[in-house]
């Protein structure tokens, strides 16, 4: 990482061990970057390239003692080619209207978030998030963050929170209408972000971490090609083989 200001002032510490939120039978630790007020968009972009991610004002990366399951992944958008199911999802939802909104609380957004968590992640803890926890998670940011809502007519179908980096976009979180069981909103959301990257001439869409053992993350390896940060370098990954990020 660069050594000039403000990079030289960034400090890192390791958290105490805690139960892994992805693999419940494992113990995790995180490496946290501080102080938060110095982590602006240029600094955060460099941190993301080094495997970090953020949750609200908390910038971290996995720092586990005996596990390397978390692989930071990104899509090189120039090389991406959608498969048949992705083309179908794009066509199915072509009438969705995307609107950028202020990074501010909306009762309508929170209601959709609650429905999504209760349906897709029941019992995971986030389904119990109150308004304050929701706001801390998605509406607090020290970088260039966009909140985009997707509507079908007047009906809110999906919300995406996206960070703009110096070399791409980082998909922070997306939640959508869980009652439309035939829909492919999550796939469409990623395809939409890929198109935004291309339009802005940004080379990468960062998708956070991929864990081979986590079924909830299988969707990420359906986007080809996919690069992972493995042993300190970004390269194309083989989902059947790769898993260690360091």
From Swiss-Prot:
Organism: Aromatoleum aromaticum (strain DSM 19018 / LMG 30748 / EbN1)
Name of the protein described by the UniProt record: Aspartate/glutamate leucyltransferase
Tagged with keyword Transferase: yes
Homology family: Belongs to the R-transferase family. Bpt subfamily.
A GO MF term: leucyl-tRNA--protein transferase activity
Matching HAMAP family: Bpt
Task performed by this protein: Functions in the N-end rule pathway of protein degradation where it conjugates Leu from its aminoacyl-tRNA to the N-termini of proteins containing an N-terminal aspartate or glutamate.
The entry's keywords: Acyltransferase, Cytoplasm, Transferase
GO cellular component: cytoplasm
EC number: 2.3.2.29
Source domain of life: Bacteria
Location, primary (coarse class): cytoplasm
């Amino acid at each position: 990482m660069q050594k000039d200001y403000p990079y030289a002032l960034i400090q890192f510490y390791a958290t105490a061990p805690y139960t892994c939120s992805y693999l419940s039978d494992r113990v995790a630790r995180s490496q946290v970057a501080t102080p938060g007020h110095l982590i602006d968009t240029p600094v955060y972009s460099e941190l993301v390239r080094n495997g970090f991610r953020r949750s609200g004002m908390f910038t971290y990366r996995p720092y586990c003692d005996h596990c390397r399951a978390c692989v930071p992944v990104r899509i090189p958008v120039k090389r991406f080619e959608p498969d048949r199911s992705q083309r179908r999802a794009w066509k199915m939802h072509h009438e969705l209207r995307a609107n950028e909104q202020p990074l501010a609380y909306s009762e309508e957004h929170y209601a959709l978030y609650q429905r999504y968590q209760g349906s897709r992640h029941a019992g995971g803890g986030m389904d119990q998030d109150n308004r304050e926890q929701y706001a801390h998670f998605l509406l607090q940011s020290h970088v260039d963050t966009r909140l985009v809502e997707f509507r079908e007519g007047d009906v809110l179908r999906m919300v995406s929170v996206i960070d703009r980096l110096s070399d791409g976009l980082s998909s922070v979180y997306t939640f959508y209408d869980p009652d439309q069981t035939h829909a492919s909103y999550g796939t469409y959301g990623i395809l939409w972000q890929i198109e935004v990257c291309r339009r802005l001439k940004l080379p990468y869409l960062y998708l956070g971490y991929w864990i081979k053992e986590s079924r909830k993350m299988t969707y990420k390896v359906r986007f080809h090609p996919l690069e992972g940060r493995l042993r300190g370098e970004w390269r194309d990954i083989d989902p059947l083989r790769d898993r260690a990020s360091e």
